[in-house]
């Protein structure tokens, strides 16, 4: 029997919604990254985008363990000499776009390259509980119930 290799025309993508309230950031990001890549499917093929469309709501209510809320730093470079910048997770979560913490965590768990960029476009993260994807009828997934370590009650 030959090894199964899925073709891009055979891919069936589902819509999944995840409520991130009180979920641990790294555990949520790992789960979402696997869903985006399609590794949860028996038809997983490394060079084909067969992952699901994932919607994450309440990204501003994510939980960080230990002292990461105040100590974790996000770095970027402006492109100018000496232009390294940093912000803490607290500054990002209390700032204008708190959903970027979840986006960055998932982005860094997906392989870099053209396929990874295409898979990352299937991720939609919203700070609040409202989202414009009701027409897709997303299936709700309770990540907190999968493992007791996935959820933190603050």
Swiss-Prot record:
Keyword terms: Ribonucleoprotein, Ribosomal protein
Superkingdom of this protein's organism: Bacteria
Disulfide cross-links: none
PANTHER family: LARGE RIBOSOMAL SUBUNIT PROTEIN UL13M (PTHR11545:SF2), RIBOSOMAL PROTEIN L13 (PTHR11545)
Matches recorded under InterPro entries: Ribosomal_uL13, Ribosomal_uL13_bac-type, Ribosomal_uL13_sf
Protein name as annotated: Large ribosomal subunit protein uL13
Pfam family, one: Ribosomal_L13
Family, per entry: Belongs to the universal ribosomal protein uL13 family.
Subunit field text: Part of the 50S ribosomal subunit.
Function: This protein is one of the early assembly proteins of the 50S ribosomal subunit, although it is not seen to bind rRNA by itself. It is important during the early stages of 50S assembly.
Gene giving rise to this polypeptide: rplM
Organism: Bartonella tribocorum (strain CIP 105476 / IBS 506)
């Amino acid at each position: 029997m030959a090894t199964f290799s899925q073709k891009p025309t055979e891919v069936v993508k589902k819509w999944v919604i995840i409520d991130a309230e009180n979920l641990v950031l790294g555990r949520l990001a790992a789960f979402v990254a696997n869903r985006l890549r399609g590794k949860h499917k028996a038809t997983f093929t490394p060079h084909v985008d067969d992952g699901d469309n994932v919607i994450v709501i309440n990204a501003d209510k994510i939980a960080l363990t230990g002292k990461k809320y105040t100590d974790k730093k996000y770095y970027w470079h402006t492109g100018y000499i000496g232009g390294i910048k940093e912000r803490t997770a607290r500054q990002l979560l209390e700032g204008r776009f708190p959903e970027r913490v979840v986006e960055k965590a998932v982005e860094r768990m997906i392989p870099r390259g053209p396929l990874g960029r295409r898979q990352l476009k299937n991720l939609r993260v919203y700070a609040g509980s409202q989202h414009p994807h009701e027409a897709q009828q997303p299936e709700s997934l309770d990540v907190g119930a999968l493992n007791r370590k996935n959820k933190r009650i603050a």
